[in-house]
């Protein structure tokens, strides 16, 4: 899943190309190797003032990654099974800006995935559950 911010892009095709471009810039995956399945729901992130236009895509084989450490802190590949397993979705009580909040996150392969990525994965998980 690439979370292309798509700033200034208006049309879905532009967002799709932006997602492929971001995937290349951040991970080194050639855009010609990415088969886009389709878009997920755009997501506005108030804290960063970005609107994210996520897409789901697939690759025919495992890519040789060239990770840009300024953009990507870690890459791991959880299985579809672990993503759809109800035990991997968790909620943490926290304080944010003086308010009690519940923060949803995934624990996948002992990696915590939260924030915008968690929200995007939640939608993807719902789609997967609808087709399995």
Regions found by a protein language model. Give the residues of each.
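Single conserved hydrophobic/aromatic residue that forms the stacking wall/gate
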Residues: 1-11
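Unchanged
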Residues: 9-114, 122-132
């Amino acid at each position: 899943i690439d979370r292309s911010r798509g700033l200034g892009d208006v049309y879905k095709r532009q967002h799709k190309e932006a997602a492929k471009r971001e995937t290349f810039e951040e991970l080194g995956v050639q855009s010609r190797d990415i088969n886009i399945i389709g878009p997920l729901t755009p997501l506005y992130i108030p804290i960063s003032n970005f609107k994210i236009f996520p897409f789901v895509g697939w690759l025919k084989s495992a890519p040789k990654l060239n990770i840009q450490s300024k953009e990507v802190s870690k890459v791991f590949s959880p299985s579809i099974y672990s993503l759809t397993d109800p035990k991997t979705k968790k909620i943490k009580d926290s304080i944010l800006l003086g308010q009690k909040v519940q923060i949803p996150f995934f624990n996948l392969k002992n990696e915590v995935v939260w924030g915008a990525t968690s929200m995007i994965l939640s939608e993807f998980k719902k789609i997967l559950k609808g087709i399995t």
